[in-house]
């Protein structure tokens, strides 16, 4: 019996079903999404760093969010593309799982911070620069990054304590923790319950300040007498609100459920939304609805064209 078990740290990812032709089509689609994600988020990081008009807490947090989007998609998509070309691949458990979930935790922490930032900007504008000063912003970002990495210490340790089937075939395109638990030969009920509580704490814990902030923001905006004033105020947080709905909605379906080993195809679809579609959409959401970012992009393109002409 013991010959069929192992404490594996490497797994064979089965990826997506279907013919080789379908895999090539999926490869082209996901490769395009990946390139646009990298370029879009990199552009946001660069213009926030170089354009003085974007030297504010909101865009400082946005640049870190874009950095996390690049990390999340780079952790998952290249391995997924490799699997589509070569019909499955091997992936190391510790590095992939820890980085993936750490980045996700940091992203939700930043979304909560950005909601509070918008609350201060809309509801307490006269004290905005005092409350959201540079030291506060830097410390908030540092805490978010550190918390993201620390939150994965116990889950990774607990996962390494399990023994797995020697086949090590994982029916997913990345090391999904729910599917890892499904491969375990041990009783994972307690670990699943603790992971469920951790997911609730991280997702709901960062969602509460977001909901409270938006409640105050909307109530404040509705008191503005002019329609143009209300539209301008709503535009300051519309892009963030869109990201919150997409990010929290998909992850609540994916992680906040007591039984993590159910619904393989369902998990794959929602995982694609989290790891591919959301990072792809975020640059467009934050640029198309933000006049300052669009102006900075136009000016940057003009400067680049001028340099090429010279």
Curated annotation (Swiss-Prot):
Primary location class: membrane
Compartments, record wording: Cell membrane
UniProt-listed SUPFAM superfamilies: Family A G protein-coupled receptor-like
One MF annotation (Gene Ontology) recorded for this entry: G protein-coupled receptor activity
Ranges in the topological domain labelled Extracellular: 1-24, 75-98, 157-193, 255-267
Transmembrane spans: 25-45, 54-74, 136-156, 194-213, 234-254, 268-288
PROSITE patterns: G_PROTEIN_RECEP_F1_1, G_PROTEIN_RECEP_F1_2
GO cellular component: plasma membrane
Topological type in the membrane: Multi-pass membrane protein
Regions of this protein lying in the Cytoplasmic compartment: 46-53, 117-135, 214-233, 289-310
Family as reported in the entry's similarity comment: Belongs to the G-protein coupled receptor 1 family.
Functional description taken from the UniProt entry: Odorant receptor.
Protein name (database record): Olfactory receptor 9A2
Organism per entry: Homo sapiens
Underlying gene: OR9A2
């Amino acid at each position: 019996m013991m010959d069929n078990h192992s404490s594996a740290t490497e797994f064979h990812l089965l990826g997506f079903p279907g013919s080789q032709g379908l895999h090539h089509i999926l490869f082209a689609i996901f490769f395009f999404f990946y390139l646009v994600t990298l370029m879009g988020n990199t552009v946001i990081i660069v213009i926030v760093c170089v354009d003085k008009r974007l030297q504010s807490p909101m865009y400082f947090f946005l640049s870190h969010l874009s950095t996390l989007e690049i990390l999340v998609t780079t952790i998952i998509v290249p391995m997924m593309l490799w699997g589509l070309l070569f019909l499955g691949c091997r992936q190391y458990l510790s590095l992939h799982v820890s980085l993936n979930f750490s980045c996700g935790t940091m992203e939700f922490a930043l979304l909560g911070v950005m909601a509070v930032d918008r609350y201060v900007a809309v509801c307490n504008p006269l004290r905005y620069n005092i409350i959201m000063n540079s030291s506060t912003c830097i410390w908030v970002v540092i805490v978010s990054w550190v918390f993201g990495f620390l939150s994965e210490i116990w889950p990774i340790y607990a996962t390494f304590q399990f023994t797995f089937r020697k086949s090590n075939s994982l029916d997913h395109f990345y090391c999904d923790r729910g599917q890892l638990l499904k491969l375990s030969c041990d009783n994972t009920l307690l670990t699943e319950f603790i992971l469920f509580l951790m997911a609730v704490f991280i997702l709901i814990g960062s969602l509460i300040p977001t909901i409270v902030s938006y409640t105050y923001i909307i109530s404040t905006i509705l008191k503005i007498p002019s329609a143009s004033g209300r539209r301008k105020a709503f535009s300051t947080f519309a892009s963030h609100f869109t990201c919150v709905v997409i990010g929290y909605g998909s992850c609540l379906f994916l992680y906040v459920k007591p039984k993590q080993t159910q619904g393989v195809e369902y998990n794959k679809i929602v995982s694609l939304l989290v790891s591919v579609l959301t990072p792809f959409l975020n640059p467009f959401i934050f640029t198309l609805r933000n006049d300052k970012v669009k102006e900075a992009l136009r000016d940057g393109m003009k400067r680049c064209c001028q340099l090429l002409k010279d």
